[in-house]
A protein has these predicted regions:
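A conserved acidic beta->alpha catalytic loop
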Residues: 38-47, 66-68
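Conserved donor NDP-sugar-binding/catalytic core segment of glycosyltransferases
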Residues: 107-139
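C-terminal subregions of glycosyltransferases and related glycan-biosynthesis enzymes
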Residues: 182-184, 189, 196, 211-355
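Conserved short acidic donor-positioning loop in nucleotide-sugar-dependent glycosyltransferases
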Residues: 23, 39-40, 99
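Glycine-rich, basic loop-to-helix element that forms the pyrophosphate-binding segment
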Residues: 66-89
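Short, acidic, metal-binding catalytic loop of nucleotide-sugar glycosyltransferases
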Residues: 21-31
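Short aromatic/hydrophobic "clamp" motif used to bind/position activated sugar donors
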Residues: 94
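Conserved nucleotide-sugar donor-binding catalytic segment
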Residues: 79, 127, 144-225
């Protein structure tokens, strides 16, 4: 058994010590390797990494070519690097880590491997994480129960950072090639890809410090673009985990509906360059988001199909809400009843021995 740590850097020399030493401090109960992908840094990141390579032969460095005259999409770029590292990895398990983040506990890998070796149906062992900024620490509160969870349970509502997980390496070279062609292998895309092939076990222990600089891509987006990005994510998720399309559609329905209702503002809100970039990427995926943005150019049959998908999803979402309200009402009524009445009700409904 072997585990691979896939670490990515770009001009993060000041964080190399903290991130790499947090890996080296882990209690790892098997062979391991640390595959580092650098995206053409110019601030001394590579030199910092090489200092650790002289002391530890388990660290391997992959430096990517970078044209200073080209503007790269950050997500596509880091996805390509991760997939390159994964392609060269030898571990039956792996973890990912961004260069400015770090691990907070020494035992989580040991705990995860113990659980996953006992249950081969698990594709992910997930833990909790904390957002860390210069003046604040905020612990995430995921909407998921401790223990084993199905793919459906996670995909409907939950967010756990992929770097707070241990993954079983379920990808063969054919699947890696497919993901390379897709282009997206970042955070929740990784979660979706793994949930296509297995379940998840969740342990509510904070193991990752997820650094917040205040200048992230998401932080700088308008509300309109955040909805656009979420709707675009729907197409990516369904490519990674197509058998859970219904759950994924419910997860992203609010943004899909928003973009459909406000599609006429697409170029005005985003600007010509950014809007054209989304269109170019969406065309490659050829999914629902692309059809929504181009709704007014679709033929009658395709328009009807888009409307039906949105209408059916809205109905399904309404039914789920009604069921939830009934369950909640039942709990409230039970809580308000006198204890002796609840006990009497439970006794009356308890089957006799031998039934």
């Amino acid at each position: 058994m072997k585990i691979s740590f896939l670490v990515t850097y770009y001009n993060q020399a000041r964080f190399v010590k903290q991130s790499l030493e947090s890996i080296l401090a882990l209690n790892v109960p098997c062979d391991y390797e640390i595959l580092v992908g650098d995206d053409g840094s110019t601030d001394g990141t590579v030199e910092e990494i090489k200092k650790y390579m002289t002391e530890n032969s388990n660290i391997k460095l992959f430096v990517m070519d970078r044209d200073v005259n080209v503007t790269y999409d950050a997500v596509l770029r880091v996805s390509a690097i991760r997939l390159h590292l994964l392609e060269n990895s030898k571990g039956s398990y792996y973890c990912i880590l961004d260069g400015d983040d770090w691990y907070l506990t020494k035992t989580f890998v040991q705990e995860a491997l113990h659980i996953m070796e006992q249950d081969q149906t698990l594709s992910i062992c997930a833990f909790n994480f904390a957002w860390v900024s210069n003046d604040d620490i905020k612990i995430h509160s995921p909407s998921i129960k401790e223990g084993k969870n199905s793919a459906q349970e996670y995909l409907l509502t939950t967010y756990i950072h992929a770097a707070a997980c241990v993954f079983r390496n379920v990808f063969d070279m054919e699947k890696i090639q497919f993901m390379k062609e897709l282009g997206f292998f970042d955070d929740q895309n990784i979660m979706a890809a793994h949930l296509q092939d297995g379940g998840m076990y969740y342990i509510p222990k904070v193991v990752l410090a997820y650094r917040q600089t205040g200048s992230g891509i998401w932080t700088g987006m308008s509300q309109y673009e955040k909805h656009v990005l979420d709707a675009f994510e729907y197409d990516i998720f369904t490519k990674h985990a197509h058998k859970y399309e219904k759950e994924i559609r419910l997860r992203f329905f609010t943004s899909l509906k928003f973009v459909w209702s406000n599609r006429d503002r697409f170029y005005i809100e985003l600007g010509s360059k950014k809007a054209s970039n989304y269109i170019s990427l969406a065309k490659k995926l050829d999914g629902l988001f692309y059809r929504i943005i181009n709704f007014d150019k679709l033929n009658t049959k395709d328009r009807h199909c888009v409307r039906k998908i949105l209408k059916d999803t809205l109905l399904h979402k309404f039914i789920r809400c009604v069921k939830y309200m009934f369950r909640l009402a039942g709990k409230i009524v039970k809580a308000l009843l006198p204890y002796w009445l609840v006990d009497l009700f439970n006794k009356k409904n308890k089957p006799a021995i031998g039934q």
